[in-house]
Amino acid sequence: MERDNEPGPATIIVTPKVDNEAALRHHTNLAQASRYRDESSDDDTIGPGRLRTPTEFDRQGSAARASWQQQISSRIPSIVKKGWAKTVTWVKGPQPPRIYTITPFFPKLQHAPIALLDRYAPRTIQRIALLAALYCLWLMSFSLLLWKSSVAAEIPGYGNPIRLSCTARYWEDGNACGVDGNLCRPFSNTSLAFRCPADCHKVQVSNPHAVGDQEIVYKPVVVGGPADQQTGFDLVDNAVYRGDSWICASAVHSGFISDFEGGCGVLQMTGEQPSFTGGTRSNIPSTPFSSYFPQSFGFLSGTKTQCKDLRWPALAPTLVFTILISLFTTNPAVHFWSIFVVLFFHVALVSDPPSNTTYYGLVSVAFGRFLPAAFCAWVVYRYAIKRSLTHLTAQVEKTILWVGAAWVGALNNYTFDRIPIQRLTPHDIKAQPGALPALIIIILAIICIALGQAWAFRVEGRMPKYLGIYGLFVLTLLIFMAIPGLNLRIHHYILGLIFLPGTSFQNRPSLVYQGLLLGLFVNGIARWGFAPILETPASLLKGAQLESLLPAVTILAISAKNITFGLGSLPVYDSKLDNTYDGISILVNDVERFRGFSDDAYHWDDSTVLGKNYTWTWNRHGIEDGKGEEDVLSEGFPEYFRFGYMAGSDSADYTKAGVWASDGSWMEMKPGPSK
């Protein structure tokens, strides 16, 4: 039978005995812990920081206020924001970036120098020994050629020649030689042993140089040539040159030395000459002058020695050295520093040395410029060049592209100097033939190269960084341009420093640009030093015309024997240059013959009234020597007069030359200044 209501077995629950004291402590700890839970509803927070329970009023006024960025963004049209976003994405480049590397053409051929070195000099010590031997061979050959070119050139009877630059001369421009030229003596009966460099025909004067009523510009300053009159000296071709002629260009013009090799010889001062011929000889043009000049010179026959400018023979050891370093070196530091050092000293001492009369002085200048140049080189190597040369094994391509371009830049005086731009100034670009088209071509080439390099930066994902760097460069240049009283001048060494960071890729175009810019930097520092990027107008002009106020000259009396000029009143204020002139200087045949000031009555013909209508009388040259009027007229030599104001000891622009003809007639000055 089933027993539905029958109770089951009893369940026994055993409750353990609890310690009331322990339980109390447990509950107390839990309560304390719960107080420090980091919740917004924590009611245990007291004081001013306690959160109040939100009310309906709070919920109605709690709309979030937009930030200023959001307010500006809301006002920008969506099409602009989309375009900006796409531009930013494009500038950042592909993801992941693609890093340029050069895969050599004909790798077996290009790796042959490295394989040869691995086979015969596998150990590091062996390679260091070979490198040291190469350094020693270059230094020895370079030093011997330099010694032969500079020291071993004594001229018997005259001693060691003085080293001249292509623009060396006796007579200075304007009134720099003083009244009657006394600061540029001697005029005659003295000789000078000299040495001239090669290729002086390429050196041209940038500012107009006055020769009577003519001007020489963009060609060598040579006045004279073979003369009809005898000088009393045994001169080469009886060629006589005016004292303001460039000595080395005149020596080439006379046929005394070769323009290709330069040379040594002896110059003889021949005093005053009545006139000077002209004409082109040995690719050097000469300007004639139809009147007298107190100082002249020629070149003594039989004094030419076998000394030569060995810049081309000295190129061979340095060129071979750089080629060997490039072919057999994969270490970027060894490659860069070896080539940089030898290029620098080759330019500074051989191919384009600065002007200095002794080689000891030349070496001193070279070392003085080398240390700061080396610091700049370290910066560009560390942040630009090292990236291009690291792991580059295309030895032949590296030699042709990088080293070849470096030589093109370092020999700037034979490569880019042929471009008809002497200085990047508005005056020169306007005045020099061919300068404007050349500048346009250069700018277009730079733009094309810059676009190509910008694309490479984008491909490598580095465009944003370099846009910032070059933006900073541009901003700095704009600030420099805005500084009053100074002019911005970008020298070619500065161009190298600015553009070198933009070549930090390992691709073939960048190797060419990098080598070229490094060569330009080396040439700029070794030849000219760290010329300032900001120059004063006076320093930038360097003998150019100032566009100053010119004297208003009148003829008061004139005859065949003398002439009297009215010079106006002094002092005179020049509002354009903000300068007050208290004196006047007069050049006769490009020699200062008078210098007078407003406070000195002694100098003027009419000393009774100071400051008013100054006059000055000049007697024709030769009258003081006892020659009669008929003798003076028969000689037929005109005289050329130029007038310029002075402020203290500083002269302003001179007028163009007025001509006092031998028959007593006067030809007025053309408008405009001269120098």
List each model region and its residues.
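Multi-pass membrane glycosyltransferase architecture that uses lipid-linked
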Residues: 319, 346-353, 511-543
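Juxtamembrane/interfacial segments around transmembrane helices
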Residues: 184-188, 367-371, 493-502, 517-529, ...
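Short hydrophobic alpha-helical membrane-embedded segments
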Residues: 109-112, 116, 292-296, 309-319, ...
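Extended, intrinsically disordered cytoplasmic tails
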Residues: 529, 533, 537-675
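Interhelical loop segments of eukaryotic multi-pass membrane proteins
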Residues: 147-170, 338-345, 357-365, 389-396, ...
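Soluble extramembrane domains flanking the early transmembrane region of eukaryotic membrane proteins
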Residues: 2-3, 7-316, 632-639, 647-675
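Hydrophobic alpha-helical transmembrane segments corresponding to the first two to three helices
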Residues: 293-430, 435-452
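Generic detector of multi-pass transmembrane helix bundles and their immediately adjacent loops
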Residues: 385-532
